[in-house]
Every structure is written in C-alpha cells, then in structure tokens.
C-alpha cells in the first residue's frame, strides 16, 4: 500500500444547463477531495486505500462502486444507516468561478470516529493524506487528529490540502485555526494561491517560504490555476507553467494535481526535502499537465486522463 486518505467522499452536483423555465439540470459526479487525490494516484501507478463513511443510500452505493472501479481499496469505507451521504452543489458565475453549497447537517463523512478506523491500512501505507473538511466538526475532527498522530508515530509521511470551503465553517477564524493545525502536521502540502492569500495575505513565493520555515513542511506545492504552480523544498524552488486548455469544469483539478505530484514523488523514492531542482520541475510539469487536462471534462474522479495522454501533452 502506498497512500491512505481520510476524509469526505461525496456527490458533486454540477449544473449542465437551464431548462425553459429557468430551472437547472444537474449531473451527479462522484467526488470529495481525498478520493479525487487517491483516484489520480491510482491512475498513475500507486496503490491506495480510503478511510471514510457514506450513508446507506443510493449515492453511498454509487460512491463505493466508483472507488472499487477506480482500484481504490474500500476496506476502510464504512456505511452508516443513520445519516445521508454528503452532497455538494457546484455553481458557476459568468466568469466561470465556482461557488459551493452543501447538504451536510450532518453528512455521513462527519460522523466517522477514530475507533472505527481500520488502522491496519495505515500500518501498510507509506503516506497518509487528509484535508480540512474532516476538521470542520466532531467526531471526524478528533478521528483525523488521532489518525495523523498515529501515522506520524509510525513513521509515515503526512500530506495535507487545506481545500478551503468557507460555507462549511462557523466563521473564517475557525477555518484558519484548523487549517494551520493541519499545516503543522504535514510533510507535504498542496495549497492554492487563493488559500495562501486567505491565510497570510501574501503571494505564492512568500507562502511557500512560510510553510517551510514556520511549519516544518518538507515540500510545498502552491497551485496558481491556469498560471501553473510553484514547488519548493529546502534545496530548490521552481515555477512550472500549465498547458493552455479550454476548461469545462475545474472541480477536482487541485486534488488531481496533488495526487499526480505525489505519484511521481513516490516513484522517485526520495525524501521530499532531497528532491533536486530538475526532479521538482518534472513533478510539477506532470501534475500541472494532468490537472489541466482534467478540466476539459466534467467531474473529479471521472475526469482523470490516462498517463499516456499526460505524457503526450508534455512532449507536444
């Protein structure tokens, strides 16, 4: 086992079109940042497993089936009959920017407890990945904190993605507090330039430097949308451009970037802080290309393109 992720598995509803009465027609896509991340890893050669919970409902069954079809180990995916599977509704404004609303009061992902986790999966893995959505409320917050402590105590790498979704937090300060906690646990961080501005009011370069100097992060990866990304460790910092594409749906692109980058890191078999400038560039190019190409298709998990397609685009 290479990577285990803990957190939310949900349905992303995206608007396809509006009918003649002005009502949206929506498509239901399997999603959730940790599983988008795992699906990219799996697509690009890693072995993965998921720790989480869905409801005993139609969408929960669909999500389990989707993970199984993606090759993700579902031994750690639990079903709860007392709560519904979490739903997210994604809408776009005239500029193509996304906004989110959620049916999660509570959702199945939020009621996961530490005593329910299959810790044998963590024992097998090289890396644990998590995000801030599993820190929004109890009991999943404590489950995440205890899982991170368990993984660190057993010598595993920890990867964290802030994945800021303000509608799920009581207020911005609560989000900031928990995200900063997550950053302090992490060896590897994938963060967007918008999230850097939210936390510190600065740009990608200063944000990456802060992650290394103030939080002990060993590899910082800052995504900048169509402008590409910045990767930095103790020895080097590189800027990588993203290929130009005409996006259809950017849902999950950041997660796919993160999973793609970690897949390359694991293949190299080197410590994150030991990666050379050339290695960071290669990781960034592959991840930025995979993420960009995914935006040409709807959904998250379903939008991940084959490795041959990524490599062909990089060569072209």
Residue ranges and their predicted role:
Residues 86, 132-136, 291, 297-300:
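Glycine-rich phosphate/pyrophosphate-binding beta-alpha loops
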Residues 4, 149-150, 201-316:
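Conserved phosphate-binding/catalytic region of the ribokinase-like
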Residues 47-132, 312-316:
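Conserved N-terminal subdomain of the carbohydrate kinase-like
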């Amino acid at each position: 086992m290479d990577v285990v992720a803990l957190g939310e598995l949900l349905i992303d509803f995206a608007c396809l079109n509006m009918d003649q009465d002005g009502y949206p027609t929506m498509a239901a896509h399997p999603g959730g940042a940790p599983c988008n991340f795992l699906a990219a890893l799996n697509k690009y050669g890693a072995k993965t497993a998921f720790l989480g919970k869905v409801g005993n409902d139609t969408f929960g069954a669909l999500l389990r089936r989707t993970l199984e079809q993606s090759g993700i180990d579902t031994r750690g995916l639990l079903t709860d009959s007392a709560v519904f599977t979490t739903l997210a509704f994604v809408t776009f404004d005239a500029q193509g920017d996304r906004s989110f609303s959620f049916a999660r009061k509570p959702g199945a992902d939020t009621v996961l407890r530490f005593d329910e986790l299959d810790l044998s999966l963590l024992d097998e893995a090289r890396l644990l990945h998590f995000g801030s959505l599993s820190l929004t409320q109890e009991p999943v917050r404590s489950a995440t904190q205890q899982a991170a402590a368990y993984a660190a105590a057993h010598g595993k790498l920890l990867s964290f993605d802030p994945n800021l979704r303000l509608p799920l937090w009581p207020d911005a300060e609560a989000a900031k507090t928990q995200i900063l906690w997550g950053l302090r646990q992490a060896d590897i961080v994938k963060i967007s330039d918008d999230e850097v501005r939210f936390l510190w009011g600065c740009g990608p370069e200063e944000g990456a430097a802060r992650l290394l100097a103030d939080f002990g992060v060993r590899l910082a990866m800052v995504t900048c949308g169509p402008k590409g990304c910045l990767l930095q460790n103790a020895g080097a910092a590189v800027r990588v451009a993203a290929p130009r594409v005409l996006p259809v749906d950017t849902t999950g692109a950041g997660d796919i970037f993160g999973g793609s980058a970690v897949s390359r890191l694991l293949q190299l078999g080197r410590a994150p802080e030991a990666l050379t400038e050339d290695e960071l560039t290669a990781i960034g190019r592959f991840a930025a290309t995979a993420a960009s190409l995914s935006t040409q298709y709807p959904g998250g998990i379903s939008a991940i393109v084959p490795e041959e397609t990524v490599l062909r685009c990089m060569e072209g």
